[in-house]
Amino acid sequence: MKPPDRPTPGRTDRILGVMGGMLRACAVPGQEGPQERDPLGPGSTKTESECTEEDQTGEREREVLAWAPQPESYSIAGSEGSMSASAVSGLAALSGPSSGLSSHPCSPVPPGPVTGLRRWLDHSKHCLSVETEADSGQTRQCENWMLEPTLTTGQELPELTLLTTLLEGPGVKAQPAEEETLSQAPKNEEEQKKTALERSMFVLSELVETERMYVDDLGQIVEGYMATMATQGVPESLRGRDRIVFGNIQQIYEWHRDYFLQELQQCLKDPDWLAQLFIKHERRLHMYVVYCQNKPKSEHVLSEFGDSYFEELRQQLGHRLQLSDLLIKPVQRIMKYQLLLKDFLKYYRRAGMDTEELEQAVEVMCFVPKRCNDMMSLGRLRGFEGKLTAQGKLLGQDTFLVTEPEAGGLLSSRGRERRVFLFEQIVIFSEALGGGGRGGTQPGYVYKNSIKASDPAVSQAWIKQVAQILESQRDFLNALQSPIEYQRRESQTNSLGRSGGPGVGSPGRMAQVSMHTPINGSLPSLLLLPRGEVPRAPLPLDTQALSETPLTPYDPPALPTVNSPPGQARLAKLDEDEL
């Protein structure tokens, strides 16, 4: 729809005249306008209908005055210039009957300023409705003409839409919520990345600062205790055992002080170098494994002289921490690296950075502490004749309930708790001593038995069988949770020609083993054969070994008599993680 043409100067004068009369009536509510000339003469009288129409016109004017605002001092401008409200009132008064909008003598109801004002407001409403239908260019022209007319000098008109606002209510154009959300989304995403990057740098700063404090703590040991003992000498009872107390802590201190701390400080300028730093020094970090392996021996010596000789040295050096508190720092530090790296990886990934090498660094720093923990447990093992380092890697360790045959080949009715260490070439059974690690002291272990695997193939067979037994126990757990699904799967297995007897993965086999296990099933169970029996050939773990003694009523059906390796074990452990 085409917007209406711009008003001519003559029309502007008429509009100003209407508004001037309206404002004059508002300024003096009780005052009437100039008396109009009666065409019938001074002696004429009006009819009753004319009086009624005049009364109705007066009521309509009073209704308009009721909601019309009080006049303010503002200027009204047209194409000819601007004038104040008082000037407009005077102009309307002077115009009188000569104005084009004055009452007509023959009209029973003079149009008056109210009627003209209503017409003008209706026309304004019509132009405002055009705004939603016209295109953007035409809408802007109509809006500029009706709402924001300007003078030739560039000055803006005051708000001419005051009365329209009173009739229609205020209309505020707000930006759609969807457009506002879309405009803010990229900004919020960038702010989140920036915040995540700042947090990653905070973690990196914490890593460097704690590394500096860690080097200072190691310096108290090397440059304090060790230097003083080398200068003043050690007691006769401690001579030759002082190296056991400190282990290789001097090597750790010098490497961190001269190399690792400086390289970490360089990472503050280039954070991408942090991952490569830990990956590069993976082999160097294994000196912590050596330190942790010696740590139990160090604790034993320190317990003998800690309250006497080393306490005197602490007071002499003026240290706040005791020597035992300083010697635990390397163990705590190697555990702390993985925590800080995980936090740095989390925020660095949120910042949109490349984290492939950083993930490898986290894996490295998770493996090294595990090795340290294993070596500390092995360092507490006593009574084993041989070198533990010659038994290959430690594959795992856990606590089991072990049942050994008594005299006459009968199984004991009560299992014994044993700590089992699985190496590549041997399985070691030990008994735990001490309070189980409560109160800050780690338990020691006394050697009880072992199972030697002389062939790597035998070792792999053991590992395979252990994995199968763990899988069977998962199946047993699934059978308890979903018996119908388990029976359906077993029936399909039997239909394929496999033996339907209780096997490794059947609940019947587990029930058979449980006849000889104690009531407490929180720990796994192992069955050890009499000591001294020489095996002829290694057998899988799921083969029942029989002795030459008569079978008890609780024994399973007889199988071909074979010999098994000493300590042939049967695991009946439900994986605690699965529970």
UniProtKB/Swiss-Prot annotation:
InterPro entries: DBL_dom_sf, DH_dom, PH-like_dom_sf, RhoGEF_Guanine_NuclExch_SF, SOS1_NGEF_PH
Localisation per UniProt entry: Cytoplasm, Myofibril, Sarcomere; Cell membrane
A molecular function GO annotation: guanyl-nucleotide exchange factor activity
GO biological process terms held by the UniProt record: axon guidance
Pfam families recorded: RhoGEF (PF00621), SOS1_NGEF_PH (PF22697)
Sections of the chain in a coiled coil: none
Segments of this protein annotated with the region Disordered: 27-61, 172-194, 487-516, 546-579
Stretches assigned to the DH domain: 199-375
Segments of this protein annotated with the region Sufficient to bind activated GNAQ: 472-498
PROSITE patterns: DH_2
SUPFAM superfamilies, sorted: DBL homology domain (DH-domain), PH domain-like
GO CC, alphabetical: cytoplasm; extrinsic component of membrane; myofibril; plasma membrane; sarcomere
Entry keyword set: Cell membrane, Cytoplasm, Guanine-nucleotide releasing factor, Membrane
Function: May play a role in actin cytoskeleton reorganization in different tissues since its activation induces formation of actin stress fibers. It works as a guanine nucleotide exchange factor for Rho family of small GTPases. Links specifically G alpha q/11-coupled receptors to RHOA activation. May be an important regulator of processes involved in axon and dendrite formation. In neurons seems to be an exchange factor primarily for RAC1. Involved in skeletal myogenesis.
Quaternary state and interactors: Interacts with activated GNAQ and GNA11. Interacts with RHOA, CDC42 and RAC1. Interacts (via the DH domain) with POPDC1 (via the C-terminus cytoplasmic tail).
Protein name: Rho guanine nucleotide exchange factor 25
